[in-house]
């Protein structure tokens, strides 16, 4: 009897201002696990705000595959959305990456809240309004909430083969972070989106939701959620130098709107100049400065001004494809 495999096709819908993840399952016989074996598929774009009802077919082009850690004989297949004629759909952020190779390295720091649908607040949110401060990298039942959920997600990501480099509890209650490193903007974006999908699916089991909004608690004295992007190319890693790094930072400062436009919706609520952020209207960079737009890590300095920079402005709900594309574009324009 032929072995049956479950292929979960994942894509981004047309909702604005922040796209959501969608998925559906295809069953294949004698599937060996390669991307080349994954056929194009279609879906009803009129149900995802990506087409009109009278001409509703959109195409799914597989671009990334990994093991599905939650299913027997399962695979996760990240897809680009195409129009019926095969051209990139307007909602296809991956297609905005014009130049992509392994020379550009990306490390994303994905923050988010574990959200309790019953209270409509972060998991463990204090009734007595305990101020933040005790929750960052914390331990213990008074400080840390949802560790079992987080550990399960970490295991799922590792079992899927995603390059997660670490996790930690964040500054606000119920807020967590994981880090993913990959070479190439498309590969990094693929891994972030699949990891987000796994976070959502894992949370279902616990009756929880994942809140990607950058400031879900509004204008309160609680940190928002970002997705800091650490980046470098061969020139930054091999040549480096204070002049080169400053030159790149200055180029980012000349393109504030270009970056903010793709760094995530509602980011103005987070980038206020408070809570370890620079104002969305300003630009600054500095060594180890977590209140700057771009932080120059101490490790970069110690390595002779060689290595990575960290743009702290992207929000937790930002599209890593679009973020990677603009980081590459601006960095290259500085040379």
What are these language model-derived features?
Residues 1-335:
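Glycine-rich, acidic/polar active-site loops that bind/position phosphate-bearing ligands
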């Amino acid at each position: 009897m032929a072995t049956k495999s479950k292929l979960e096709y994942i894509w981004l819908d047309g909702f604005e201002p922040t796209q959501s993840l969608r998925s559906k399952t295809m069953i294949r016989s004698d599937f060996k696990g390669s991307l080349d074996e994954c056929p194009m598929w279609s879906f009803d774009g009129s149900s995802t705000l990506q087409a009109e009802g009278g001409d509703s077919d959109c195409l799914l082009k597989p671009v990334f595959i990994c093991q599905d850690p939650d299913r027997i004989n399962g695979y996760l297949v990240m897809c680009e959305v195409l129009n019926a004629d095969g051209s990139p759909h307007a909602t296809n952020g991956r297609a905005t990456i014009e130049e992509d190779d392994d020379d550009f390295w990306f490390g994303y720091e994905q923050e988010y809240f574990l959200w309790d649908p019953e209270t409509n607040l972060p998991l463990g949110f204090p009734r007595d309004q305990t101020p933040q401060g005790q929750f960052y990298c914390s331990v213990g039942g008074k400080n840390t909430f949802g560790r079992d959920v987080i550990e399960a997600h970490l295991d799922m990501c590792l079992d899927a083969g995603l390059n997660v480099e670490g996790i930690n509890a964040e500054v606000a209650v119920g807020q967590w972070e994981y880090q993913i490193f990959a070479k190439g903007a498309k590969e990094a974006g693929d891994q972030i989106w699949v990891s987000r999908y796994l976070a959502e699916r894992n949370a279902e089991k616990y009756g929880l939701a994942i809140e990607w909004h950058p400031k879900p608690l509004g204008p309160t004295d609680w940190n928002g959620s970002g997705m800091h992007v650490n980046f470098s190319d061969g020139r930054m890693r091999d040549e480096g130098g204070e002049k080169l790094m400053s030159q790149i930072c200055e180029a980012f400062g000349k393109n504030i709107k270009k970056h903010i436009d793709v760094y995530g919706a509602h980011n103005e609520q987070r980038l206020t100049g408070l809570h370890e952020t620079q104002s969305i209207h300003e630009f600054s960079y500095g060594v180890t400065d977590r209140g700057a737009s771009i932080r120059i890590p101490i490790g970069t300095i110690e390595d002779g001004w060689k290595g990575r920079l960290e743009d702290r402005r992207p929000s937790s709900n930002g599209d890593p494809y679009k973020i990677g594309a603009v980081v590459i574009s601006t960095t290259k324009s500085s040379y």
